[in-house]
């Protein structure tokens, strides 16, 4: 018994020793939480350019030097969906496969995702950010949402940020980060736009930014091969081995502050290697056979800091080879370029209140085939309402509808009986679904 008591006392003393700084120098290095900043870094769809978000927060003195910040985000939700076609649910906030959604009705009450982040700055020029993600609903692992392969942790983002906008208009980052391509943000409280699913890239690389005179120019050198999302170039003799830094994207946008209550942003981007470069049959992360660039242009307006309006269009430069199925009867449809469009608006009634209420509406689409083809298009409509609590956590409800069912894997069919019969595809331009999702994101 005495041995147990001694051990407990030693543990308590050790805990007090490691948690209490012994010198004034050690007191300068603090560990803490900043829910408002953590929300901006961990929310999944309002502003996905996290390198720029962190730099802007540093510029606004919201992240002091020599402080390590811990952040967490938990998104839980319940939803119900109904489809007019058996086992074809096109809502993309979970992978649309029959492994997880069967029949013509689906419902769930689940954890959508959990994030844990560490970020901080060692001085006025150097900062770092790392985010660990658990997301069985949207994992690329095989099986159902309870399978081991879909219940894994991953370092979703991680980068070192170099720069000080107070002293110099250039800053950069190296690591795993979102590609600065287009407007991948959404006005929805939870759901990402179809534009995001189609063109929002995530990969290893090095980024350089210029920000001054209301101009923001960004260039990113991206590791080649098939990256984590929406980025792919041919490496060597048609492999996807990421052994060369041979992909890049560039973005330029300009913000026009007409008055203190109205600003307008316009921008355009170019991507050297989009993911739409594979031959038939298409499968995630397979090697490409060409480099297929993409371009985008976008705009957004902010009125009275209450009304936000966005619009964007993106398209590949070349046809996607894999959208041509050589087997009849589907061989009547030629290979097609890929494009996406998004338009939306949201209005916040009381942005300065402890609970800010927002209503939103958004349309986005994905065009991957010629008129009449089963993989022609997938449309998404969202109506949303949310309450943002202390600028750090929110509850939300969305009503959504989809038209078309166009998964990327085997979008135009497969080799005979691998897994589909010859001349068939699981894509459908007639499939449609309706649903409602309610949930909460709690951030510390």
Protein language model regions, located:
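Loop-centered beta-sheet repeat module
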Residues: 226-281, 290
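Outer membrane beta-barrel
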Residues: 61-84, 103-227, 249, 253-260, ...
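N-terminal periplasmic/intermembrane-space "pro-region" immediately following the signal or transit peptide
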Residues: 20-89
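Bacterial N-terminal signal peptides that target proteins for export
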Residues: 1-10
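Bacterial N-terminal signal peptides
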Residues: 9-18
């Amino acid at each position: 018994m005495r041995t147990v008591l001694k051990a407990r006392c030693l543990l308590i003393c050790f805990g007090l020793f490691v948690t209490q700084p012994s010198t004034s120098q050690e007191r300068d290095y603090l560990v803490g939480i900043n829910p408002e900043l953590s929300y901006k870094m961990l929310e999944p769809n309002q502003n996905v350019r996290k390198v720029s978000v962190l730099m802007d927060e540093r510029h606004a003195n919201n992240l002091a030097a020599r402080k390590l910040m811990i952040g967490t985000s938990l998104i839980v939700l319940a939803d119900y969906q109904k489809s007019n076609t058996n086992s074809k649910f096109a809502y993309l906030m979970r992978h649309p496969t029959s492994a997880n959604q069967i029949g013509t009705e689906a419902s769930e009450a689940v954890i959508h995702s959990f994030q844990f982040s560490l970020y901080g700055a060692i001085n006025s020029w150097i900062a770092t950010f790392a985010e660990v993600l658990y997301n069985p609903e949207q994992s690329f692992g095989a099986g159902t949402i309870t399978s081991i392969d879909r219940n894994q942790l991953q370092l979703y983002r991680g980068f070192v940020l170099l720069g000080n906008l107070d002293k110099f208009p250039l800053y950069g980052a190296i690591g795993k980060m979102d590609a600065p391509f287009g407007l991948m943000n959404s006005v929805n409280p939870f759901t990402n736009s179809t534009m995001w699913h189609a063109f929002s890239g995530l990969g290893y690389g090095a980024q350089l930014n210029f920000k001054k005179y209301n101009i923001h120019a960004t260039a990113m050198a991206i590791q080649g091969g098939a990256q984590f999302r929406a980025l792919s170039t041919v490496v060597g003799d048609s492999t996807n081995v990421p052994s060369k830094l041979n992909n890049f994207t560039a973005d330029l946008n300009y913000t026009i502050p007409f008055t203190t209550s109205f600003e307008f942003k316009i921008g355009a981007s170019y991507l050297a290697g989009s993911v739409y470069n594979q031959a038939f049959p298409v499968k995630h992360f397979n090697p490409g056979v060409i480099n297929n660039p993409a371009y985008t242009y976008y705009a957004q307006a902010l009125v009275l800091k209450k009304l936000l309006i966005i619009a964007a269009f993106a398209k590949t430069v070349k046809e996607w080879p894999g959208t041509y199925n050589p087997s009849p009867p589907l061989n009547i449809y030629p290979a097609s370029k890929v494009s996406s469009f998004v338009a939306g608006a949201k209005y916040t009634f009381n942005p300065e209140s402890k609970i800010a209420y927002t209503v939103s509406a958004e349309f986005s689409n994905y065009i991957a085939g010629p008129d009449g083809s089963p993989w022609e298009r997938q449309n998404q409509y969202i109506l949303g309402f949310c309450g943002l609590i202390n600028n750090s956590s929110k509850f939300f409800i969305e009503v959504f509808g989809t038209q078309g069912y166009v998964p990327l894997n085997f979008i135009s069919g497969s080799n005979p009986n691998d897994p589909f019969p010859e001349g068939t595809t699981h894509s459908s331009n007639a499939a449609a679904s309706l649903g409602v999702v309610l949930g909460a994101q709690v951030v510390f």
